[in-house]
Structure formats: structure tokens, C-alpha cells
Design a protein with these regions (language model features):
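Bacterial N-terminal signal peptides that target proteins for export
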Residues: 1-13
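Flexible, low-complexity junctional segments that flank or bridge functional domains
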Residues: 26-294, 302, 308, 315-322, ...
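C-terminal "post-core" interaction segments
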Residues: 259, 263-274, 280-293, 298, ...
Length: 544
């Protein structure tokens, strides 16, 4: 059945009213009913008009039906959603509640952490509200940023003798416009000198990455060796690109395509004839140079749009890749059509527009086919790069969700896939946004992806073939910009794909640019400040 959406003003106003009435279950009576009132005790869900309590209820009751591990959740009376009210800010109460919901699944547990591994909730009224939280990076699904533009830092040496480098910069950001790139050494931020007391600067570095500093003066040395003093960076809104850089590198008589990608932003043109102004030129260039081997740099890529991941798979895949690409598997409640709470959610497309049938009926998420057959996706080759044989992925603990899906789904269809870096995040599950109180989007893990061989379940992360263990010379060397063949991870990847005299042996490079002696410290905050946005699905098939 063809999905249609309407942009007329009158119907749009009606849709807004419907979202308000349905999206957050805001009624004076108890709504929705528990999953199975005859079995589970539900005496504590009394009628209320309190908006926070209604949203508390909705968050739990949606999880009871759509959470991938919904069978682990207790009854309403045992969980008591309305007890999450101790914080002044409602969003913090809902985050606390969601965190406690996910504690019932061992897959969501992060030892010692006060946040869920996968689930999150955001306030859409906040600036860049569709981002997860301060613990995630600052580009939204359409590559709009609101920050200084620094992805993260890397620190090499000991706590008393170390150097700090910018590890990534978003294109067109304030940092990029000031000439700061990956490879820029930072020696001072404001009055805080950097290099001799690591513990004393962690708070300042984190403040930059968390947007707690709205403006700051930076001093240091640019990647080309040019010193700079008191360059002011101020948080601003900007249009960026998810592609850090791409190039063709010639080594050992072979052209290797290199591509550094920050997130799976929504396609510039989606639907049945997709295209993307950021990705298409990259792979056209690879095709024109006869590339058969790729290095795909996902070390700072925490996921994004599933549709974009599928499109990228179709750009990468050789012409021999046909048939099934992957499946999305939902829980039994959803597959059997028993997730009746989804009647409260108007079905939207990737841009948030409500979808209607050809007869004008507004679709809800209850109209979606959640079966395995309805959520199986197939190869449909895109672009002119048709002969890819070998791929090396550069990865880290911030490589998650759609990034891991890309790796898992291409494996059965090329000759060789190798990973260089540190273990990935481990997130084979995804979600779609649930609107609550016409204000909050809850992202509750609802499906798991499996490749064409039925492989998946990498909850513990993917372990690299060439592991950066801090001792073997393989290092995320932020002294070099993306695409520089001397950078540690890329140097290792090139030695795998196009070995020359120095080569690699047992996961070692013969030489890596020197870093200060001692332990290599990496500044982290809540998952390494990589934009762990998840694996977001916005395409759905209507039940027949």
C-alpha cells in the first residue's frame, strides 16, 4: 500500500491536535490499559490529569509493549512509574524512569553507569532537542550542529607530561572556520595551561565537549606547525557534513579508497529513488579510480539513520551482492499485533510528517507490519563502484549502532573484512521515536538487526583483528589529520590492503609516529563523546 502524507495547513492543525491527544496518553481516565489486566496487578494506575504522571505512565506502558526485552519488565504496580518525580526538571525524572526500566535487561546494563546503554529520551523544545543528551555529540540528523565543533580530544603521555590534540572537527563549525583540524595541538584554554597536570584540565576539556563553556580562548599549534594564541571559539549553530573527508590513496601499486564518516545522517533524498549529495560523489570518485579496496573510518561514528546505512551498503556492495541484506526483528507482542498502545502514535516519515492513506485516513504505528517478512530488506545496487573486494574498518568504543550494522551486513558479500582499533560499542538494536506529551521523544530499543546469514547479537562489541591495546604500536594518532597515511590506524589498514616493505605482522606496524613515552591517556566522558545516536528506523510497511 502506498503511503501518502499531507502538508495542508488545516489537516496539519488537526494532526497536531491528534498528537497532543494521543502521543502522550493525556486523558483524565486511565489510558492506555495495561498489557494484561487479568494477570498483572494494576491498582496503582489511578485516574490523573497531572502531565508528569501521565508521561510517567506512558513511558512505562509503551516499554511494556514495544521494548525488545519487554518480557523482563514487571507489572505497573511493582514498577510504580509515578514515583519518578524527585528532580525539579521533568526530563530528568523521565530519564531516571527510563534508566530504571532498562535495568531489567542485562543487555542494557553498563556497570557503574547511571545511564542506559541504548535507550534515551529527549526534550524536543530544547536547542537541538533531537540529540540524546550532553553525553552525546552535537550534530542532529540533518547535520545541523550547535557547539564549537570539536568532536573530542586525544591525550598522549603521562599525567604529568602529556600532549593534547583535537581528534576531530565538524566541517563548517566554529572550530573548522578558525582553521582548527584534527592534528591541532592545544596548549591552553582560557587561563588553563595544558601539558603537566592532566587531572587539573579534565574538567575544562569536558566543559568544551559538553557545551558548558559557551565561549573560550584557545592557544596551541595547528597541524601545519603554525602556532596560534587566544583564538576565540563560541558555540554557534551551523550546517555541517557527516563526511569528515575522503580520498584515494595509492600504495603498493594499488588505489585504496579512504572515507571518514561521522554519522549516518538522513539522506538528502529518501524513498524509492534515494540519493545523497555527501555520499554519492565519494563513491563516484572511487569508481573513477578503479578502487577495489576500501578503508572506512567509523571510529567516531555512533550511528544514525538505518535508511542511510542501507543506502551506504548499496553503494559499497559489489555487483554480485543480491538478495537479502538484513532483517529487523521485533518482539512477539509487536509481531503478533498485540502492541495496541501504538494506536496512540500517529505514523510519521523521516521528517516528522504524519502519513495518511489514499483515502485520507491517518496512519498510526499500529497499522505497521512488524513481522519478520515485513521487515526484511534486499540489495539494490547504487552508484558505479561495482568491484569492492576487501574492506578495513577503523573502529573504537564509539563505533555503534548503524556503524556496526554496516560492518555486520557487508561481511557476507565481500572477500575480506578486517577491523583495526578498539572494541566497538556493541549495539545491534534500534528504535523509532515515541512522542510523549507532544514534547518528548523516547527512543526505546525495539528491534534487533541480523545480516543475510542471520548473524548479529554483538552486544559485547566487535573485537578488532588488529587491536589497539596500548602496547603494540597501533594507536589512534590524532597528531595526523583524517586520511594521512602516517596516522596509526590508517597506516595499519593500508599495510593490510596494500603491503609494502615495512608491512604488518601479527597486527603490528613496523613503525608508528612517536608519541610521548608512558601510558596513553584518552580523555573520555560518557562514551567518549562520540555521537551515539543509535540506529533509528523511519521506514515502515503498512499491514495488508
Amino acid at each position: 500500500m502506498k503511503l501518502l502524507f499531507w502538508s495542508g495547513k488545516s489537516k496539519f492543525l488537526i494532526a497536531l491536535l491528534l498528537i497532543t491527544a494521543l502521543g502522550a496518553c493525556k486523558k483524565s481516565k486511565v489510558n492506555p490499559d495495561p498489557v494484561d489486566p487479568a494477570v498483572e496487578s494494576n491498582t496503582k494506575q489511578t485516574p490523573t490529569t497531572n502531565r508528569r504522571e501521565l508521561t510517567n505512565d506512558s513511558l512505562f506502558l509503551y516499554a511494556k509493549q514495544i521494548y525488545f526485552w519487554n518480557t523482563t519488565l514487571p507489572s505497573y504496580d511493582v514498577f510504580e512509574p509515578r514515583k519518578y518525580k524527585t528532580y525539579p526538571l521533568d526530563l530528568d525524572n523521565f530519564r531516571d524512569e527510563l534508566f530504571n526500566i532498562t535495568k531489567y535487561s542485562t543487555f542494557e546494563t553498563v556497570p557503574g553507569a547511571n545511564y542506559s546503554k541504548y535507550a534515551y529520551i529527549v526534550d524536543n523544545t530544547e536547542s537541538n532537542g533531537n540529540q540524546a543528551s550532553a553525553k552525546f555529540a552535537s550534530l542532529d540528523a540533518n547535520d545541523v550542529g550547535y557547539d564549537m565543533g570539536i568532536v573530542t580530544f586525544r591525550n598522549y603521555g603521562t599525567e604529568t607530561n602529556y600532549t593534547t590534540y583535537v581528534a576531530g572537527v565538524y566541517p563548517n563549525s566554529p572550530a573548522a572556520n578558525a582553521g582548527i583540524t584534527r592534528g591541532t595541538q592545544i596548549t591552553k584554554i582560557g587561563n588553563v595551561s595544558i601539558g603537566t597536570n592532566f587531572n587539573s584540565v579534565v574538567q575544562t576539556l569536558n566543559a568544551v565537549l559538553n557545551n558548558r563553556l559557551t565561549t573560550a580562548l584557545f592557544s596551541g599549534i595547528k597541524a601545519d606547525g603554525t602556532p596560534f594564541t587566544d583564538v576565540r571559539l563560541t558555540i554557534a549553530r551551523y550546517n555541517s557534513s557527516s563526511v569528515f573527508t575522503s580520498k584515494v590513496i595509492t600504495q603498493g601499486g594499488k588505489n585504496v579508497g579512504y572515507f571518514a564518516y561521522s554519522r549516518f545522517s538522513v539522506l538528502t533524498v529518501g524513498g524509492k529513488t534515494p540519493s545523497d549529495v555527501r555520499l554519492d560523489p565519494v563513491f563516484a570518485e572511487f569508481a573513477s579510480k578503479g578502487v577495489t579496496d576500501l578503508v572506512i573510518d567509523l571510529r567516531y561514528n555512533g550511528g544514525g539513520s538505518v535508511e542511510t546505512a542501507e543506502y551506504l551498503l548499496n553503494l559499497i556492495a559489489p555487483s554480485t551482492a543480491t538478495g537479502k541484506m538484513y532483517q529487523e526483528l521485533y518482539n512477539n507482542t509487536m509481531k503478533t499485533g498485540k502492541a495496541t498502545i501504538l494506536e496512540k502514535q500517529p505514523l510519521t516519515d523521516g521528517s516528522g510528517k504524519i502519513l495518511y492513506s489514499s483515502s485520507g485516513k491517518m496512519y498510526t504505528y499500529d497499522d505497521v507490519d512488524w513481522t519478520e517478512a515485513g521487515n526484511t530488506y534486499y540489495f539494490s545496487k547504487k552508484g558505479s563502484l561495482t568491484g569492492v573486494k576487501n574492506i578495513v574498518f577503523l573502529v573504537s568504543g564509539g563505533t555503534a549502532s548503524a556503524s556496526e550494522m554496516l560492518i555486520n551486513c557487508i561481511k557476507p558479500h565481500v572477500q575480506s573484512v578486517k577491523l583495526v582499533g578498539t572494541k566497538t560499542y556493541g549495539k545491534p538494536v534500534g528504535f523509532f521515536p515515541i512522542l510523549l506529551d507532544n514534547r518528548y521523544n523516547a527512543y526505546i530499543p525495539s528491534f534487533e538487526t541480523r545480516n543475510s546469514r542471520g548473524e548479529g547479537g554483538y552486544y559485547a562489541g566487535m573485537t578488532p583483528d588488529y587491536l589497539d591495546d596500548g602496547n603494540n604500536g597501533i594507536v589512534d594518532d590524532a597528531k595526523y589529520d583524517f586520511g594521512n597515511p602516517n596516522e596509526g590506524y590508517l597506516k595499519t589498514a593500508l599495510s593490510i590492503l596494500a603491503p609494502v616493505a615495512q608491512g604488518v605482522s601479527s597486527g603490528r606496524t613496523s613503525s608508528v609516529a612517536s608519541t610521548p613515552a608512558g601510558n596513553i591517556k584518552t580523555l573520555t566522558f560518557a562514551n567518549d563523546n562520540i555521537e551515539n545516536v543509535g540506529m533509528i528506523e523511519t521506514r515502515f510497511k503498512i499491514k495488508k
